[in-house]
């Protein structure tokens, strides 16, 4: 359901300065003011005062400062906001080694401590700001408490760095692979750790399967 909240043109303009070209901004915080989504803060890398390579710590120092800014502007997460953050991190790919990645994350921050009315307004207005930003350019996260906005939580859920998503992808694709290779009749061993692949464990699984 639409809330009737409009999006200020400066929202898209500022976002372009974060997502395109020289990437002037590192993060932007948006708020709803008088039925309009506006830019509350647009922070540059220089303003963060971080001189090291963001890829070395997967943006942790920058992200920690971003979280503190959000907490300050929401009175310790008792108010709602939207935000975008340019997340730089490294990930390991099989056969490709370590790669540097850049993802823009969009946070819909509706903390448990905010009023029900505020949460409803921000939830119903989220589609409007995401459309303005362009959903194809952002990874979307919903935040209801500080733990869901932790650096570790978001890093683990970024594509190419998400162990849970990789396991889900492999699990959902195994049937198609077996059908393509004509392996439907073969016995299948699932391994969640290296001990599941030792000879004794595999033999035990084979014997158990024969008894069924």
UniProtKB/Swiss-Prot annotation:
InterPro entries: ADF-H, ADF-H/Gelsolin-like_dom_sf, ADF/Cofilin. This is Actin-depolymerizing factor 1, isoforms a/b. One of its GO terms (molecular function) is actin filament binding. GO terms for cellular component: actin cytoskeleton; cytoplasm; ribonucleoprotein complex; striated muscle thin filament. Belongs to the actin-binding proteins ADF family. Gene3D superfamilies: Severin (3.40.20.10). Keywords: Actin-binding. PROSITE patterns: ADF_H. Signal peptide: none annotated. Residues 3-159 form the ADF-H domain. Pfam families: Cofilin_ADF. One of its GO terms (biological process) is muscle thin filament assembly. Depolymerizes growing actin filaments in muscle cells; required for the assembly of actin filaments into the functional contractile myofilament lattice of muscle. Competes with unc-87 for actin binding and inhibits the actin-bundling activity of unc-87. The keyword S-adenosyl-L-methionine does not apply. Interacts with F-actin. It comes from the Eukaryota.
């Amino acid at each position: 359901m639409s809330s009737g909240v409009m999006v200020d043109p400066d929202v898209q303009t500022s976002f372009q300065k974060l997502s395109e070209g020289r990437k002037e901004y590192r993060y932007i915080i948006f708020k709803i003011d008088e039925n309009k989504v506006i830019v509350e803060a647009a922070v540059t890398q220089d303003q963060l005062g971080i001189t090291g390579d963001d890829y070395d710590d997967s943006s942790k120092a920058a992200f920690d400062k971003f979280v503190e800014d959000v907490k300050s502007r929401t009175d310790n997460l008792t108010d709602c906001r939207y935000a975008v953050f340019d997340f730089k991190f490294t990930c390991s790919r099989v056969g490709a080694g370590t790669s540097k990645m850049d993802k823009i994350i969009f946070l819909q921050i509706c903390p448990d401590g905010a009023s029900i009315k505020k949460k409803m307004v921000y939830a119903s207005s989220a589609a409007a700001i995401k459309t303005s930003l362009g959903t194809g350019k952002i990874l979307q996260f919903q935040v209801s408490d500080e733990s869901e906005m932790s650096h570790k939580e978001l890093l683990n859920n970024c594509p190419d760095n998400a162990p849970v998503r990789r396991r889900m992808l492999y699990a959902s694709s195994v049937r198609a692979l077996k059908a393509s290779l004509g392996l439907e009749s073969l016995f299948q061993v699932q391994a969640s750790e290296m001990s599941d692949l030792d000879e004794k464990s595999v033999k035990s699984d084979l014997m158990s399967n024969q008894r069924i």
